[in-house]
């Protein structure tokens, strides 16, 4: 059984979380399989996916914990978070701050990533026990928001989500992101049923992030 610290390290080292939004549970599973085949381990199934909890349970039963790191996204409350953890999620991501969700995840020693947009919100999330703080919607400010927050809070582990793509992912990493959350720019091929494209895009993201990390280390 992998610990929370080990799972956090896996996310940080890979530098990316695949954010899965889909029109059906079947499509979500295919996307998850494609991004995994492309080398991405951390896969976030959002609660907007029909049957999202069953998708999480299916993935948890299909793959070993060292093969895939399943998370639940768009989680708004502690009740939903607990259901997802029981289904097999190893981390919980929220677009906003909810103290009860953070408490619950810490109770079960699972990773929790609440959403924030300002230094005040990030600090509040960290003080409440957040492991990583999701910066959302990141596209409103671009990579400079990471630099701005890490000015007074250099210790803050930040996960920008929204607006991250192959053309700018290097900028987000250079700015100091813990990792990046990528949705449509990664999984867009699924809309036309091209899961090979999703796999190829995942490979490109992994390559670019690794290259950027090597250059900045």
Where are these regions (language model features)?
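Conserved N-terminal beta1-alpha1 strand-loop-helix module at the mouth
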Residues: 1-87, 107, 155, 166-167, ...
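Catalytic cores of alpha/beta
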Residues: 31, 77-87, 120-128, 164-180
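Short, charged, surface-exposed secondary-structure boundary motifs
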Residues: 101-105, 123-128, 143-148, 168-170, ...
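Histidine/lysine/aspartate-rich catalytic loop segments that bind and position anionic ligands
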Residues: 91, 95-140
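Conserved functional loop/turn residues at catalytic and ligand-binding sites
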Residues: 39, 88, 96, 109, ...
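Glycine-rich phosphate-binding active-site loops on the catalytic face of alpha/beta enzymes
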Residues: 92-101, 135-142, 175-198
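Glycine-rich beta-to-alpha transition loops that act as phosphate-gripper elements at the mouths
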Residues: 21-23, 70-78, 94-97, 114-119, ...
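Conserved beta-strand positions in the central sheet of alpha/beta enzyme cores
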Residues: 19, 44, 71, 93, ...
């Amino acid at each position: 059984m992998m610990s929370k610290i080990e799972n956090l390290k896996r996310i940080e080292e890979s530098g990316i979380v695949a954010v899965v939004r889909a029109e059906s549970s079947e499509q979500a599973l295919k996307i998850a399989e494609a991004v995994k085949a492309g080398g991405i381990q951390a896969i976030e199934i959002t609660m907007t996916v029909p049957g999202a909890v069953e998708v999480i349970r299916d993935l948890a039963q299909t793959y070993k914990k060292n093969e895939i790191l399943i998370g639940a996204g768009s989680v708004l409350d502690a009740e939903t978070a607990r259901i997802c953890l029981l289904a097999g999620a190893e981390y919980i991501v929220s677009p906003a701050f909810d103290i009860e969700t953070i408490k619950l995840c810490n109770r079960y020693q699972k990773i929790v990533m609440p959403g924030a947009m300002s230094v005040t919100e990030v600090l509040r999330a960290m003080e409440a026990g957040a492991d990583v703080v999701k910066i959302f919607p990141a596209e409103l400010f671009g990579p400079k928001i990471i630099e701005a927050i890490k000015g007074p809070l250099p210790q803050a582990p930040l996960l920008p989500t929204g607006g991250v793509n192959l053309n700018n992912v290097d900028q987000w990493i250079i700015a100091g992101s813990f990792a990046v959350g990528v949705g449509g720019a990664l999984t867009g091929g699924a809309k036309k049923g091209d899961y090979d494209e999703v796999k190829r895009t995942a490979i490109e993201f992994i390559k670019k992030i690794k290259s950027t990390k090597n250059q900045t280390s």
